[in-house]
Amino acid sequence: MREYKIAAIPADGIGPEVIAAGLQVLEALEKRSGDFSIHTETFDWGSDYYKKNGVMMPADGLEQLKKFDAIFFGAVGAPDVPDHITLWGLRLPICQGFDQYANVRPTKVLPGITPPLRNCGPGDLDWVIVRENSEGEYSGHGGRAHKGLPEEVGTEVAIFTRVGVTRIMRYAFKLAQARPRKLLTVVTKSNAQRHGMVMWDEIAAEVSKEFPDVTWDKMLVDAMTVRMTLKPQSLDTIVATNLHADILSDLAGALAGSLGVAPTANIDPERRFPSMFEPIHGSAFDITGKGIANPVATFWTAAQMLEHLGEKDAATRLMSAVERVTEAGILTPDVGGTANTQQVTDAVCEAIAGSNIL
């Protein structure tokens, strides 16, 4: 019996709702497979913890998480706590503290979900966006001077290192090489950002020589939004900086139908530390407590987690169950359905068990 220890951090907004759904589905997979077990410990870190303790997580939070095989994360952010506090107090310290430098965000149109793109047919939108997750625009360097005065100034410094850019390019090329189309698009803005982004382009060209079987091209980030919208079938694997990929992956989720179906994995490819898996939709306080949050993104990121742990059969079984459920029209309101979170979750669990969901 293979055993895994998972740290669950539901955190804020709809995070607890979708993580509860995800844990229910993982339990169903565990029962169906019969050859692995998942032991979960839940941490109450997040905005409520901050209001009580003045920090989003305890000082030894990373040390507590080191003993786990993976982290299952909900969402962070609250209306009454500044966003820079919630993000820099919990999610980013985990990503950067554990050097989860590869943020992997798959996107495709699931059966039964109608995308907003008029000319997008089956298979036309099937991408993986690789986001540099450790430096770039979110490196945390900068400051403010003369605060409150007319001459106040704020700086936000993007940091690009040869080590950081090389490893994310190599990861992206390897991923593209493993996918059927062997196609990679490198997103840049080197026409206007003439230092870090020019280095980014140069390193992409250097790394490409290691992968002669991968076809790659380069695209300015603003033009990339147009290409994603008008020619989705021309794309497959995409690599971009921390900020650019953050924006483009939200666009990708929307083009696939909803952020409620968009997952992400924060990976330490060297496996020195636990990797973290989460939906990208955020805390969504406008629907918190209504029971209508879409759990599909959480199921998909659970599949990413299972695959990372080596349970590929269980990951495939989970995604097959999700696609059976969406194809049957059991959908939450954000993708045009009338089902609630629990109904979708129960249907996926039944599909995993082999029951007839129709």
UniProtKB/Swiss-Prot annotation:
Cofactor note: Binds 1 Mg(2+) or Mn(2+) ion per subunit.
Cofactor: Mg(2+); Mn(2+); K(+)
Keywords for this protein: Cytoplasm, Lyase, Manganese, Metal-binding, NAD, Oxidoreductase, Plasmid
Positions annotated to bind Mn(2+): D222, D246, D250
Listed SMART domains: Iso_dh
InterPro entries: ICDH/IPMDH, IsoCit/isopropylmalate_DH_CS, IsoPropMal-DH-like_dom, TTC_DH
Listed EC numbers: 1.1.1.93, 4.1.1.73, 1.1.1.83
Cellular component terms per the entry's GO annotation: cytoplasm
PROSITE patterns recorded: IDH_IMDH (PS00470)
Function: Has multiple catalytic activities. Apart from catalyzing the oxidation of (+)-tartrate to oxaloglycolate, also converts meso-tartrate to D-glycerate and catalyzes the oxidative decarboxylation of D-malate to pyruvate.
Record protein name field: Probable tartrate dehydrogenase/decarboxylase TtuC'
